[in-house]
Amino acid sequence: MKHLLGLGLVASLLGLVGCGGEEPASGADSLVIYSPHSDEIRAEFEAAFQDWYRTQTGREVEVSWPDVGGSSLMLKRLQDKFLSGRDDVDVAFGGGAIYERMKQLGFLEPYRLPDDVLAAIPKTAAGQPLYDPEFCWYGAAISTFGLIYNKQIIQDRGLPMPETWEAMADPKYFGLVGAGDPAKSGSVRKAYEIILQAYGYEKGMAILVRMAANAREFFASASDIPRACAKGEIAVGPCIDFYAQRQRLSEGGESLGFVTPKGLTVLNCDPIAVLKGAPNRRVAEKFVEFVMRPEGQRLWMLPPGAPGGPKQHALERLAVLPSLYGPDAGTRPAMNPFELPPADFYDAAKEDARLAILPDYLRVALVENHEPLRRAWQAVIRKGTPLEPGVSLLVQPLLSEEEMARLGREVWTPIVTLEGATPDEQAEAQRKEEARQRRKSDLETAWSETLRRRYEQLF
């Protein structure tokens, strides 16, 4: 097992205190799950699993869900936890692309599903893998990414209907875009990564900068964007499909639309995995099995109250079992992901290379400097056409694509050492980790100062 080594993380480690679940009732088994999923998803899966587990084993199980925030924060929390040597979490459930990074860091315990369960899961959907070839993770659900928009606001203001990601960069949408913080939300980070790859790094980064400049505000949670759109606070924003669908079924949802930019988006599977050192490994494996069986997969797609479906909440997600998309399945999918062509433009290796650094770069460039960026963009817009000179200065990235990948490897990858390292080896690893963290902090400070000066030149 690999452990992260590093100092200067006391605050993060202290945040772990009290994160474990309560003591289980006498005779009950326990399961501790880290998940960025909503309360509705947690409640439905917990209740259904408890029923299934009781039938399978004759035993009760108590499930606890420590609050870990979004998937980006969940990954950081796990890094801190393994650094401290605390193996007190059993399962990671949800979070998207962070599972490949967790596998590389040695956080995941391989678990091969029973043959009948594994045989029902395709290896890919639209070219994207649905499970790890070494069985370290399984895609528990499928998602797509697009734009949620308020039809009434767009009509009242005479705005162009959004069809591609570039709509968020249009000056006509100044102050009407809702954006998310990629350092806090993995689905927001994924949406921004899709934009970078769909248009190419330079143009994609320009779209992200102009989107941020148009933003009314940055939301901490990806689910805040569709809620703000339904309230009429924003006109458009990036959104994962099931957040959009659930909001459209809620109050104010009749005014909402959702579009997946044609040829400019990609499917994403939302994995589940057993964590290394899981104290309740047998129960953890049963939970993964349940989620991947039809009994778990139906919860995503059946309406509340339907036999085998959720009890109270419509989860509105796409299952990974093709059998649930048939005419006799009783489900109501918005689309069939197994009928979509592969997204040939998407390179998972590029995503992985900047998985850690991209959220921090965008946080510094767009979120923490949002006000000077917004004022600079407003000044450019007021000057009228042509916008190109001011825009070029505004959107030019500080890092090339190659530089970002290199820094991602050299500075944004935590120092790791194998268990059993000698005291001298541990001390050396700690020294390197401290140096890495100092360099990371220095780079972020330099980026912030450079970009702030650049933005201020324009207003």
Where are these regions (language model features)?
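A bilobed periplasmic-binding-protein/Venus flytrap-type ligand-binding module shared by bacterial periplasmic
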Residues: I148-I153, L267-R281, L299-W300
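Early extracytoplasmic/lumenal segment of secretory-pathway proteins
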Residues: E22-R101, P226
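Mature extracytoplasmic/periplasmic domains
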Residues: L275, N280-A284, V288-Y346
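Ligand-binding "clamshell"
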Residues: M102-Y111, P133, Q247-T260
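A structural signal for short loop-to-beta-strand junctions that line the ligand-binding cleft
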Residues: L83, D87-V91, E109-K151, E166, ...
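Ligand-binding pocket segment of bilobal, Venus flytrap-like solute-binding proteins
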Residues: I194-F258, R298
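C-terminal non-catalytic accessory extensions
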Residues: A376, V380-F459
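Periplasmic-binding protein-like
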Residues: A120-I121, I207-A212, G252-A278, P322-Y325
